[in-house]
Amino acid sequence: MRHTIFPPIALLITLSYAQSASADVAVATYEHRPAVQNALLTERLDTLLPRLMRETQIDMWLVIAREYNDDPVFLSLVPKPRFTARRTTMLVFFDRGDAGVEKLTVSRYPLGSMYEAAWEGGDLNAQWRRLAEVIAERDPKTIAVNSSDLWPVADGLSHSLYEKLAGALGPTLSARIASAEALTVRWMETRTPAEVEVWQRGVAIARQTIAKAFSSEVITPGVTTVGDVAWFIRTRFEEQGLEPWFHPDVNRQWQGADF
C-alpha cells in the first residue's frame, strides 16, 4: 500500500542520526552470559533483597512455581542458565536480622551455591511437609506470597498452590500469609549500580540497531515498507540472541499528514 512506503525525506532525516551513532557494542555469547548474570544476581540477593524486605516489613517471602507455569519473578531469582522451574520449585527467603537473609530451596533439584538445599527429596506430599517444617522452625511474623489484584508481576502464586500451602501450614501459620506485592514490585523495579551499567550497554545496542534500521543499508526510498524495517529490527535482535519484549512497531507520522 502506498502509505507504507518510505519517502526520500525519511532517509535524509535519519542519515544524520545514523552517522552520529556510536560504534557497535559487543554482545556477549550465550556461553559467557551466565557468569555476568549470576554475579549481578548474587549482589542483588546479598545486598538489595535484605533492604527491600525490611523496607516492606516482610521477614519471610515464599516464591513457589511449577514447571511450565512460572511465577513472573521466578527467573529473576534463580541462577542461569535456567529456562523454567523444575517440577515444583520452592524458594524461601527469611530475614535473620544481622545474620542477613537466609536463602533456601525446598525442591527436587538444587539451585547451586546461591541457595541452601533444605530438602533431601521424596514425593510431592513430603515436599510440602518439609516446606511447612522449614517455616515453622523459623516462626516468621509474616509469610509473604505473590498474590496481588493490582500488579500481574506480583500475582504469580496459583490458586491451587495457595491451597496446598495453606493446607500444609495449618490454621495458625496460614493466618500469617500476606501479600508480597510491595516487595515483589520493588524487587522487579530496582536496579543496582552494576545493573545500570549493563542496561546502558543494552540501550546502546538498541540505539545502534535503530540507527542501522533507518539507514541506506536497510531503506530504499519508494521501495522499503515500514513493515520491512520493523522485521529488520526484530531479526537483528534475534540474530544476536537478544529476545525482544514485544514486536517492533514502525510508522510514519508528522503534522499535517493525511494518513
Predicted regions and their residues:
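Positively charged n-region of N-terminal signal peptides that target proteins for export
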Residues: 1-4
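Bacterial N-terminal signal peptides
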Residues: 7-17
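Acidic, glycine-rich loop-and-beta core segments that form the ion-binding/anion-interacting portion
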Residues: 234-259
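Polar low-complexity intrinsically disordered regions enriched in Ser/Thr and small residues
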Residues: 13, 230-231, 259
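A composition/biophysics-driven feature that prefers long, compositionally simple stretches
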Residues: 19-215, 223-238, 242
